[in-house]
Each structure stands twice: as C-alpha cells, then as structure tokens.
Regions:
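Intrinsically disordered, low-complexity terminal tails of fungal membrane proteins
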Residues: 1, 176-259, 335-346, 472-482
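Juxtamembrane cytosolic amphipathic helices that cap and anchor the N-termini
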Residues: 1-3, 86, 250-282
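Extracytoplasmic
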Residues: 2-33, 49-50, 104, 108, ...
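C-terminal transmembrane bundle
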Residues: 8, 12, 41-48, 55, ...
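Helix-breaking motifs and short loop linkers at transmembrane-helix boundaries and internal kinks
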Residues: 29-30, 53, 58-62, 83-89, ...
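Cytoplasmic helix-loop-helix junction between adjacent transmembrane helices
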Residues: 93-132
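Glycine-rich segments within core transmembrane alpha-helices of 12-TM secondary carriers
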Residues: 120-143, 147-148, 158-167, 171, ...
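C-terminal membrane-cytosol helix-exit motif in multi-pass small-molecule transporters
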Residues: 164-185, 331, 335, 459-463
C-alpha cells in the first residue's frame, strides 16, 4: 500500500511541478507563459488517460507486472524531461510519462479492497486520496526550492526521476501480486475438497468472453479463500508472488478493446457519476489556484521567488491532512456504529460526513477567486485553498469509499473511470485557466463552487435511498453477488 501510494503521489507531482518552473521555462524555451502553464494540463490529462490501459493489462499479465511497466515508463519520462532541449520534446516527455504513470491510480481502489476489511476501507482509502492530493503539494514545494538553489528547472526532474527509480527498485523487491488466493502446481492440498473446488474456479477456470469483464481479473476483487495451507519457505513464497503470471492461470476475454471500454458501464451508477464529477471539479479548482498563485504572487507587489511559491503549497497540504480524519476514521466510525446498532454493514451510514464539506468547500472556492481579484493577503487565500483541498481527503474520499463498498467487485472499474474523467475535467479547466480568469475573474471560481455545491446536493438521495439505488444499478451493469 505504501509503494502504491507513493507512486500515486509522484503521478500528481508530474502535473503539479510546472508552476514554480514557469518563469525559468519561459526564458529557456522562448514560449509564452500560457503555453508553459499548459504543460501541467497535458500532464494531468495523460495521467488520466494512462488509467485506460490498466484493466486490459491487468487481465492479461496481472497487477504487479502492469505497475512495474508503468512505473518504468513514468521514471524514464522524468529523465527525458530533464534532458529536453525544446518545448515539443518536453511536452512529449510529459505525455509519455503520464501515460505510464496513470495506471497506478486505477489500481489503488482495488488493492485497498483486497487488503483491508470493509470497516477499514475508508481509512485506507483516505491514504490513497491523500497521496492523490499530496503530490500536488510536494511537487511545487520541491521544485521551487530546487530551482532557486540549484539554478535550473532541469534538476527537479532529475530528483523526481531518481526518487521514482528508487521506488521502482523497492517495488520489484517488495510489491507482490496482490491477489490473495494464488494456488499453483505443487501446493499442499487443502483439507476441504469443496474449498479446493472454489479456489480452482477462482484461479484456474477460463472465463467466457461474454462474462462480466470486471471478472476477467475476478480474483483481484474476490475475497481471499478461507482454505488454510501449510507454511512455505519465505524464499519460495516471494518467488511465487513476484513471478506469478496471470495469463498462465486465467484466460481473459480475447477482445482487448472491449476491456478498455467496459469500465465505463459503471457510469450508470449515480454514486459513481457524483464521485467522478466531485473529484474532477475539486482537483480542477486546486490546479487552477496553483497556476494563479504562481502568476499572481510572482508579480509586484509580492515578487515571490520559485522557492516561496513552492513553500506556499504547505497550505493545501495542511488542508489534505485536516480532511483525513473526517473522510477516513470519521466515516469508518459512522459505519461501525451503524453495524453495532443494526447488525448490518451499510455504506450509506458514512454519507452524513459530507455535510460540513458541502457548506465549506463552495464558500472557500468562491473566496479564493475574490481574494485573487481584490488582492487579499496571501495567508487568507492560503486558508481558503486549504479548505478546498480538505474536500479531497474528506468529501471526495467518502464518496469513493462509498462506491467501492457498494460495488466491491467493481473496484478497479471505479478506479479507472474516476481517474480518467477527473483528469479530463482537470485538464479542461486548467488548460483554459489563464484565459478564463482574464475574462471572468472571480466568477470563474464562483462557477466551480456552484457545481461543487450541486454535486453535494445530488448525493442526498444516496443517503435516503442508497440501498435501493444500488440494487437497481447492479442489475444494469450485470453485477453478480457472491
């Protein structure tokens, strides 16, 4: 989980590290500040599109190999950026690196579902969503100080590439295939024959092409087998977990393109639609704020250096940390309380956590725009930026936890859809940030705030009638209960 979260965080670093480099890149590449700011947008878009190849590749070669290939491409992208001699080369490096780095975002939710009991899913998911936001903080922070103290925008890319290479090495050694019921030739026979037949069905039986495609990697989201085996040697266990090849034991549907588009069937679920849009608009708001911070505070009367711009990103980091207790432990506490009182687990029991975020987030988003337009003190703008980011680990985390708990066998599909669409939304908003801001000023942030408020209001029916909505939408996507 730690390796995965770190990879996710570095993916956000790719998109967020441009603002402190903006002025040095303008001078070095001889292009406008608008084109340089769009490098962040293209990185965000390609991180999202990189999720698309996650499900098909996992179905064929498994999660471990998929993540290692993606991380290798992602790492090479940073070193390519550091050596780029033209704007076009720099853009190409960010596009290809983003396509490699995006795959891990889709696999985060499914690994959480595999590794943690349902009553701990929100807490574990808050670490994942924190990593999604933390990269947008540490990227500018490290970049700003590296540019100021080392004198070139190239050095941060070498630093990030080295960090990713180290993470790649650690993942090769310590990140196993995460499915929990691997059985191959030579295993001790389980004592219960019926349990053995279940395991063979989960791992060994070929899947029909028209069967639910999420189950092309069905073992990824099924509960672990209850069979108990004799302990084996650590070396043999590591070798099996490290070199287990899915294709030898599970036959995914032959239509690769169908595997690419199949996750988007989950969009018939209102909960997933709300989650996708809430994540996308919230991240778009914080990306737009980051871009405007680098432009506004680098000009008179502030005249901030790249290091000061990077240091300012501590504000959203504090917001992410503030949101975690609400979206993680707070949501789990509500779910556990409902379980104790009623004897059943109900994902909707955590949704009241959304109320404070439904009030605070739209107000803070609007006041960010007002603060930029009226020249408010940087500390005031930073406070509202922190509140906006608290929604990522708070309200957004509650929604993605709700989705994965309501459709546990669709965790990877939910991860793909959420990350693709949120990054496409983030790309669209951030790509047009400067032009939109020059035209509408604070009305830009008011529009974002109103959309966020409407999405929170749209979540109310899920709290009231969530179980019936979930049952209905499960039939639409062909969801089969255990």
């Amino acid at each position: 989980m730690g390796n995965l979260s770190f990879f996710v965080m570095m993916g956000q670093v790719l998109g967020a590290s441009i603002p402190p480099m903006l002025l040095p890149l303008v001078k070095d590449m001889h292009v406008s500040s608008t084109k340089i700011s769009q490098l962040a947008s293209w990185g965000t878009l390609c991180i999202g599109l990189g999720n698309v190849w996650a499900l098909p590749t996992v179905a064929y070669i498994g999660s471990r190999y998929t993540i290692l290939i993606g991380l290798a491409v992602f790492t090479a992208g940073f070193f390519w950026q550091a050596r780029a001699q033209s704007y076009e080369s720099l853009l190409a490096a960010r596009v290809i690196g983003g396509l490699g780095g995006g795959v891990v975002e889709a696999l985060g939710p499914v690994v959480v579902v595999l590794l943690f009991p349902r009553e701990y899913v929100a807490r574990a998911m808050s670490v994942y969503t924190w990593a999604l936001g933390a990269g947008a903080v540490f990227g500018p922070l490290i970049t700003g100080y590296a540019v100021d103290n080392l004198g070139s925008w190239r050095y941060p890319n070498y630093i990030f590439g080295g960090i990713c290479a180290l993470n790649l090495l650690v993942m090769i050694l310590m990140f196993p295939e995460p499915l929990t019921n691997i059985r191959v030739a030579g295993d001790p026979e389980p004592s219960d024959i019926s349990i053995e037949s279940i395991d063979e069905e989960q791992v060994g039986e070929p899947k029909e092409p028209l069967e639910e495609v999420g189950n092309a990697q069905q073992y990824e989201t099924r509960p672990a087998s209850v069979a108990t085996f004799e302990p084996c040697k650590p070396g043999a266990l590591w070798f099996r977990r490290s070199f287990f090849l899915t294709l030898r034991h599970n036959h995914p549907p032959p239509n690769f393109f169908y595997l690419v588009v199949e996750p988007f069937r989950i969009l018939v679920s209102p909960a997933v639609i709300i989650t996708v849009l809430l994540f996308g608009i919230s991240i778009a708001g914080t990306i737009a704020t980051s871009i405007l911070v680098s432009i506004t505070f680098s000009q008179p009367p502030w005249l901030w250096t790249s290091g000061q711009v990077g240091l300012y990103n501590i504000a959203p980091l504090l917001g992410l940390l503030a949101g975690m207790p609400f979206g993680g432990a707070g949501a789990d506490w509500l779910a556990e309380r409902h379980l104790r009182r009623n004897g059943e687990f109900k994902p909707e029991s955590a949704l009241p956590i959304l109320l404070p975020f439904a009030i605070a987030t739209p107000i803070a988003t609007t006041l960010i725009g007002v603060g930029f337009q009226r020249g408010w003190h940087w500390a005031v703008v930073g406070l509202f930026w922190a509140i906006l980011n608290a929604n990522l680990t708070g309200g957004c985390n509650v929604m993605i936890s709700y989705c994965t708990e309501s459709y546990p066998k669709k965790a990877i599909q939910i991860g793909v859809v959420v990350n693709v669409i949120k990054n496409v939304i983030g790309f669209g908003v951030s790509y047009s940030t400067l032009d939109w801001w020059m035209k509408d000023k604070y009305f830009m942030f008011l529009t974002v705030a109103l959309v966020i408020f409407v999405l929170f209001v749209a979540a109310v029916p899920l709290w009231i009638s969530g179980p019936s909505i979930t049952r209905k939408t499960k039939t639409w996507v062909g969801y089969e209960e255990e």
